[in-house]
Amino acid sequence: MAQCNLFYQYPITPILEGHVRNILICTEKDVEKLQSQSSLRLREKIDQGHRDKLLRMRLKTELDALQKKMQKDSDVLNSHLKAIEDALLFTNDGEVNVETKADAQLIPKSPEKLEKFNQVAITPLDPFIRFTDDFRGEMINTFFNNAQMWNFTFGSWFYKLKRVFYNEPGLRRALKLTNVDSLTISKELLAVTVNALEQATVYPIFGSEMSDLEAALCILAAFYSTYENSQIDERTTLVDVITLLPVIFRLLGSEITALKNVSPSGTYFGFNDPSCMKFFVPMRKGKHYAENTFGNHVLIKMLLGRGVMQKIPGEKISQNFDVEARLHGAIKNDVLVYWTYQLMRPKLGNNVPIFIHDQHYLRSGLVAIESLFLLWRI
């Protein structure tokens, strides 16, 4: 065997010695190095797989949360779109298209009930309030349906106003009042207040030269000037008229009481509007109301009696006096025209409206006087 040692063992180990089968010979150190590198790459692959798994789990969680949020926002958007669609169903007269699926279950099926069925929305996104004939009356009746619910007060001013109602024998009999705290008084006051607000908030704001308060002050100044020893002259301003309102309202109350003594039914604060009238804009040439609109109003009767107004075009209650001849002549002979010109000239110059022609100023001024007089009485 000693002769074969040189075949298996060389004195100097050759590097990359050719093998008999043409295979490179690797040392154990190289093999260990290759194994270490393979293990390291495998470990990196495993770590990368774990990281990808964690990222996919986190992405799935975020996508689930985003899906839930989008679903919630979509539901809210659909509800808003449904409310907007319901609001757009209103016509100019406040009617609603009753063929929608959402309202189909809430609307009476029979034609007889459907003709009497109406609904009103306060704001576009609120549910509808349904009523049968009169929304205002049914709402007020609902408020005062249960006496046990009314355990509060509006203050001393409301009690004083109820006392005025209770002290009127005619109202006490008509409303069947037994005590001043009767809910019938509060019910009637609320109805009167709503009616007054309705009249005070529908006047046109386009092309108006003066406000309803300014129109009221012009009428009151003309009324006050008809009394002897009145404290107004050509230097009087609108502010001066406001300071004189307590004195003017005392005289106004005396005139109304005198008219009431002559005719108990003559103290009517209202206008004879046609039944087909929808807006308080004068429809006759854009300036005049229908005939006899002012016919029964107590303030008109009082102004005519004091000579503040000579004639209202088309009215049967006026005197046979043609004010047209005085409009461009001696203007001082017409008291209302004169004081309107005196008080509004600093603001409007020569473009001062004449109330008997631009009658929406006359009407808005009368309604403002009613409101101011009511506040003074309270």
Swiss-Prot record:
It comes from Human herpesvirus 6A (strain GS) (HHV-6 variant A). Belongs to the herpesviridae UL25 family. Keywords: Capsid protein, Host nucleus, Viral genome packaging, Viral release from host cell, Virion. It is found in: Virion; Host nucleus. Heterodimerizes with packaging protein U64. Interacts with major capsid protein U57 and triplex capsid protein U29, essentially at the pentamer vertices. May interact with large tegument protein U31. InterPro entries: Herpes_UL25. GO terms for cellular component: host cell nucleus; viral capsid. The keyword Ubl conjugation does not apply. It holds the Pfam family Herpes_UL25. Plays a role at the late stage in the encapsidation of viral DNA, assuring correct genome cleavage and presumably stabilizing capsids that contain full-lengtht viral genomes. Located on the external vertices of the T=16 icosahedric capsid, may bind together the tegument and the capsid through interaction with large tegument protein U31. This is Virion-packaging protein UL25 homolog. GO terms for biological process: viral genome packaging.
